[in-house]
């Protein structure tokens, strides 16, 4: 029974990470609030748009 719990926990962890990786990101110039919303990983804190890489 314990191995089933470990396998279930691993499957849930993998599924949650896959959703984050597969989520669409915003292109350069798109409106953003956080860095992780942009494909480049950089959101302007003053103007709230995605910066180029």
UniProtKB/Swiss-Prot annotation:
<keyword id="KW-1015">Disulfide bond</keyword>
<feature type="disulfide bond">
    <location>
        <begin position="25"/>
        <end position="39"/>
    </location>
</feature>
<feature type="signal peptide">
    <location>
        <begin position="1"/>
        <end position="18"/>
    </location>
</feature>
<dbReference type="Pfam" id="PF08087">
    <property type="entry name" value="Toxin_18"/>
</dbReference>
<keyword id="KW-0960">Knottin</keyword>
<dbReference type="GO" id="GO:0005576">
    <property type="term" value="C:extracellular region"/>
</dbReference>
<protein>
    <recommendedName>
        <fullName>Conotoxin-like peptide</fullName>
    </recommendedName>
</protein>
<feature type="disulfide bond">
    <location>
        <begin position="38"/>
        <end position="50"/>
    </location>
</feature>
<feature type="disulfide bond">
    <location>
        <begin position="32"/>
        <end position="43"/>
    </location>
</feature>
<keyword id="KW-0732">Signal</keyword>
<dbReference type="InterPro" id="IPR012623">
    <property type="entry name" value="Toxin_18"/>
</dbReference>
<keyword id="KW-0964">Secreted</keyword>
């Amino acid at each position: 029974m314990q191995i089933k719990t470990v396998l279930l926990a691993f499957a849930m962890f993998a599924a949650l990470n896959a959703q984050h990786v597969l989520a669409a990101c915003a292109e350069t110039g798109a409106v953003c609030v956080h860095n992780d919303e942009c494909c480049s990983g950089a959101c302007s804190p003053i103007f709230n748009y995605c910066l180029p890489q």
